[in-house]
Every structure is written in C-alpha cells, then in structure tokens.
Amino acid sequence: MNLLDLDRQALKRLFADLGEKPFRATQVLKWVHQRRVTGFEEMTDISKALRARLAERVALRLPEVLAEQVSEDGTRKWLLRVDGGQAIETVFIPDSGRGTLCVSSQVGCALDCSFCSTAQQGFNRNLSTAEIIGQYYVAYDQLTGTGEQITNVVFMGMGEPLLNLEAVIPAVRLMTDDDAYGLSKRKVTISTSGVVTMLERMREQTDVSLAVSLHAPNNALRDELVPINRKHPLERLIPACAAYIADKPHRRITWEYVMLDGVNDQDHHAHELARLLGDIPSKVNLIPFNPFPGARYRCSPRGRILRFVRILQSHGLTATTRVTRGQDIDGACGQLVGKVQDRTRRQQRLVQRELRREGR
C-alpha cells in the first residue's frame, strides 16, 4: 500500500486496525505532506515499534521525474513516470500573486474530444490517489528555491476526473486538509466534459470549484466536438451543473469554450450560448485553440474571439479570454500527451479515419 493513497479518513482506519488512536493520522499527515519526510524512521514523535509496524504495511512511493521543461513565460512542465512505466504530464503556471498546478487524473483520456491532443493518445488506466497527490508532492519539491509556490490546483491535465472519482476525491481531501496542503476549496477546481451521473456523486462528496468543458452551445455541434454529449446531452448537463452550486452562495460555474475557426465561433453561437446558460451564475472562459500534429482545426482569429466576448457580455455574462501559457513546451490546454500505451486502439482508428478522408 502506498502511503500517499491515504487521506485522513483512510489513515484513521489504518491506525484503528493497528489498535492506535486517531490522532496518529494527524501526525503522519504532517510528517509526509508538510515536513516532506519519506521514511518512517524520521517520524520521531512515533514510537519505534509503531514505525516498524507501519513499515510492514505501507511505503511511500513518488512518481519519478523523467524530464522538466521551462517555457519562456515561466510555465513548467514535468514528465512523470507512474506505476507500470507509463508517463503523465503535470504543468505549473505562474502568474502575478498565484501559481496554478494543472494535474492529470488518467493515463491518457477515456474520452475522445476531437480538438484535444491528449484524447488522440488513447487511454490506458486511471491514476491512483497516490499518483495524483504525488504530482503535487513532486511539483512542490521541484519549485523549492524558485520563489514560486502552488496556490491553486486545477484538474485539467490528462484525463476525465469524474471517471476516476474514487481516486480524485481522496486527493482533493489531502489538498484541502489543513494538516497536509491546506488549500481553500475555492482554490481547487475539478474540470469535467460532462459526466452527469458522476457530477451528482461529486456534489455529494465535495464542494470544490467546478469547470465544465462545454465548447458548443447545442447538442448537434457538441456531439461532434465532445462525443460524451451523446450520452449526457445538454438538457441533462446544464441542470446538473446548476444544481451543483445551488446551495453554494457566491459560487459560479466556469464554462470552458475552445475557439475553433469557423466551427463554433460565429455570432449566432455566442447568442445561443448565452441563452443556454441563462441565469446560472457563470464565467465563460474562451480558450484559443492550441494546435497539435494532425489537428484538423485552426484557432479563431483574435478579432473573432474578442467579438464573441463582447456578445456574451452584452447578455450580462462574465466572459474572458484565456492567455495561452506554455505553448512553446506543449504545455497549453489540450496539448498534454505523456507516454500512453493505448488500450483503446484510438490512435489506429484515427489514422484509418484520415486515410478514408484522403481517399487512400
């Protein structure tokens, strides 16, 4: 068992099994996540006998840093080896007064969004809680001495977090535990492409911030861009999102909308999007499309993006354009790929699809 898999509740269960008091969980949380201790022998306020028993039951294993890239804008991307020898990518984005860590939740992605490089890599497996919180642990260590620190976490790396809630929720609990990393729940954002059934379960287990990868204002277009929409259409997704913040005063949903030239960026799309969101407390984040090899889309012109923003604002919506960060190291939105042994044969199907289009 990996010690990083255990949040406070799991640690209490472990110590109960060992006949120990619940306060031991607090001790271990502080040693591991705040004092950065990786061996039980260094936990000096725990008896030698208990340390030995713990060592028999659990060990602390971290993802291995295979490579680090630093962008001209200060964005950092790490390639991390996880169990089984595959690799994921984690990105740190510095900004004035804040630092956002973008973590992955799967090796590859179980979904098949047509504009996302990660999706083209296929899918292998879910990450464990240890592999998710391990990204935070490693990033914290890598940033030591740089003057940068993690103030926010977004689950916007590789994978669909809501298809891995069993591992994501304990990781979130560790991030927000005052005896571990102590982030405010408002500073942690889980992004989903719209797995409605899991969104309802997420609402029962946490109240961190929610972002939704929307990308289209109607079902016909969203079916094409975000295929999971065929199973979880907008008439189910939008009410589920509204319900998530219904009992959370002063909270709002962030809607992610990638701008694709001639596809979803016309005036009528903006008006339709405003009608779709209605009076739900919202922020629309327009994302300039980040190209990748083989992509069949282009980014909307800047003038078109600004016009889209103005139309949304005319409807009373808060709308912003995301500043692209880390593009020179392929660390921007939709560009993370890692090293994935595809179990879905998605890459092979994509090649065959392109050959058919070219008439070969």
Swiss-Prot record:
Binding site for S-adenosyl-L-methionine: G159, E160, S191, S213, L214, H215, N290
EC number: 2.1.1.192
InterPro entries: Aldolase_TIM (IPR013785), Methyltransferase_A (IPR040072), RlmN_N (IPR048641), RNA_MTrfase_RlmN (IPR027492), rRNA_lsu_MTrfase_RlmN/Cfr (IPR004383), rSAM (IPR007197)
Top-rank lineage group of the source organism: Bacteria
Reactions it catalyzes: adenosine(2503) in 23S rRNA + 2 reduced [2Fe-2S]-[ferredoxin] + 2 S-adenosyl-L-methionine = 2-methyladenosine(2503) in 23S rRNA + 5'-deoxyadenosine + L-methionine + 2 oxidized [2Fe-2S]-[ferredoxin] + S-adenosyl-L-homocysteine; adenosine(37) in tRNA + 2 reduced [2Fe-2S]-[ferredoxin] + 2 S-adenosyl-L-methionine = 2-methyladenosine(37) in tRNA + 5'-deoxyadenosine + L-methionine + 2 oxidized [2Fe-2S]-[ferredoxin] + S-adenosyl-L-homocysteine
Cofactor(s) needed: [4Fe-4S] cluster
Protein localization: Cytoplasm
One GO CC annotation: cytoplasm
One protein family per Pfam: RlmN_N
Active site per database record: E89, C333
GO molecular function, one term: rRNA binding
Coiled coil segments of this chain: none
Domain Radical SAM core: 95-330
Disulfide bridge positions per record: C102-C333
Physiological role: Specifically methylates position 2 of adenine 2503 in 23S rRNA and position 2 of adenine 37 in tRNAs. m2A2503 modification seems to play a crucial role in the proofreading step occurring at the peptidyl transferase center and thus would serve to optimize ribosomal fidelity.
Stated family: Belongs to the radical SAM superfamily. RlmN family.
Protein name per the record: Dual-specificity RNA methyltransferase RlmN
